[in-house]
Amino acid sequence: MHFAESVQTPPPSRPSDQSLNQHVLDLGSWDQGCRDLMLVNWLCVDFRQRLLNVLYTSCQKNFNEARSLARERLLDLVQRIASSDNLHGALYTPPSLDSRSSATPPQNLPPTPDLVQCIRGCDEPFPPLSLPTPAQIDTQENERLMCTPEDITYHDRDSQVVAQARRRSPPGTGPAVLPPIAFDNHELPPGCSDFLNFDLLSDGEVFSIGTHAGVTSDVCDSMPLDHDLSEMELDPPPDATTTTTTTTVSSPNVHSTHHLAIPNPEPGTPTPPSPLAGTSLTRKPPGTPDSPSAASQRRQRQRRAAAHATYRSTPSPCQSADTHIGAENEVAEPAPPSPSTRWTHSIPTHLPSPDTVLATFTHHLGRGKQSIALLLTRLFYAIGSPDALSQLRDAVKLSREQTPAIIPVSSTNDLATTVKALDHLDSMTTLSHILRRYYLVRLLEHRTRFEQDHVTAKQAWRPPKRMLKYDCARVELIKNGGNCSSSSCSSSASKKNEEKREPPLKYRSKSQALADLMQMLYPDLKPAVAEGKDCVYSRKLTKLRNRLSCARNWYRFEQAFPGAILALIPCAGRFSVSIDQIEKLPSDTVQIFLDYLQEHRGVFSRCVSQTLGTGIFSVLARTSADAAPTFAFEKVEEEGFGDLLYDTDELVSLSIEYDRYCDLNSNA
């Protein structure tokens, strides 16, 4: 905010934290109009600091409550100023100063201590104002008589500017820096409503509770600047020299640096007091244009104010009802990391690119399941890949050992033994994961068979929905020449057979099948009488249910690609495919993946799975006492798998037995 200086040189400067004290208000050497103008200047800035102090020191939970509290205090202050008692004999309305002239002389009304006390607040005592004594007034009049013609001309022009600016003030309002003299906030003029606008404070640019300390910001620059305020400058006398002094003001409320332009006083003239933080007094010679820095700062403040107004007036985009409901139902997930693309150079041209696969799965699953789409993309290329054959080679090598040791035998704790033990454990992990898939599928097949038996038993017990007109018993009686009375005998016999039938099962087929599995696996365990009681039977039952749930997705893979598809899915590796993640996927998601895999890689996956066949399981599990066949991929070194391409005949040929592979190569 820019305020004009008076003709006379103000009293000496005082620290800003001691504003509005007895020394600052002792303006006896000034005339009445300039004294009132400077008083209003200090009161406005003091009120602004106190408002920021209220917001900063408020103990409310959030900023909205603190802003509401400050708004209530401000409206109460405006109401007290607008009352007729305070307006009578109060401080005259200081104008928005400009360079236009007016013939109306200013009204020099003495400042009222009650009004100053009201603006200052009731929480602190206000020191009595020091008004000029009659002797000081006579001294001031004598000094005026000794003024030079240039000073008199400047003083007349100053009075005209003040008078005309007062006329330009909107009716019922004070200056642009003071609150309007109206209680109803909706009836305020546009220029005065900015003072009651607390949205700028909530934007975090002017003030922010909790992050105020240590943040450097210019409070005045962040407030909207009116066009009249941007021109509040007066021209000094021609012989006046102007110097610029930079003053750093420290305040407990606003941690910022303010620049104050103070004219160089003549010898023997008291220096003006430094106004509060955020006030800038500038004087320049007449007809001198604004400096580039001042003009750029003014344009920057105007652009910032326009941006705030545009932001507040722009409505937020409204979502449709379907989009809003879908956004509420979707679970927000963190942005997943991008998958490794080191293997993309081995993808042939006939396969879709990773970006296309990811976009397809994202389209089917939704953007809220981006991590699952990335997992399915990696799994799409991992099945039957060279990396899968490399892991299978290590697992087969481990399974062929008669007594595989977890840790290699070594008397010394050297580095080579440690690395060899870790490689051994990785191979055991791959072997255990592959065998676990096979045995989980077998467990699910047992449960499915028991469930089908119970479904068949239920269907056999239920009577047919429609009785035949001629049942088998009646047809036999007719053939044998029996009469109609025999039908009653047949009906009575059928009723007796129905009575001999067992009552219907009370449980579902799946639950009954699960109970049969528990009975066969743990015949000595009995369920607890009280429901929800923790016992060994309930723990075993929970573990069995979890295993059946994990086997659900592997069973779908086995049904889609019969043979050895379960052995062609790598564990971790460079594709970062987690087995737990695949087991926890929903059924519909797995079905979407299998359909897409059938469409683009179905021929190759089915061929390599059938080529390995069931012989690979007998090698891994060592279920056959006979000599297990040796496969061609067992003879490939670890570095050789890096040169293989996806979905090629070479990968299929490595899946056959080694003897047949040698015969094919010799014939070729």
Swiss-Prot record:
It comes from the Eukaryota. Residues 96-106, 311-322 have a biased composition (Polar residues). Residues 495-505 have a biased composition (Basic and acidic residues). Residues 264-275 have a biased composition (Pro residues). Due to their effectiveness as antifungal agents, echinocandin derivatives can be used for the treatment of human invasive candidiasis. Residues 484-494 have a biased composition (Low complexity). Residues 1-20, 92-113, 224-322, 330-349, 483-506 are annotated as: Disordered. Pathway: Antifungal biosynthesis. Part of the gene cluster that mediates the biosynthesis of echinocandin B, a fungal lipidated cyclic hexapeptide that acts as an antifungal agent. Linoleoyl-AMP, produced by the fatty-acyl-AMP ligase ecdI, is transferred to the initiation carrier domain (T0) of ecdA. The linoleoyl-S-phosphopantetheinyl-T0 is sequentially extended with L-ornithine, L-threonine, L-proline, L-homotyrosine, L-threonine, and 4R-methyl-L-proline to form the linear hexapeptide. Thereafter, the terminal condensation (C7) performs macrocyclization of the NRPS product and the cyclic scaffold is released from ecdA. This is Echinocandin B biosynthetic cluster protein J. It comes from Aspergillus rugulosus. The lineage of its organism: Eukaryota, Fungi, Dikarya, Ascomycota, Pezizomycotina.
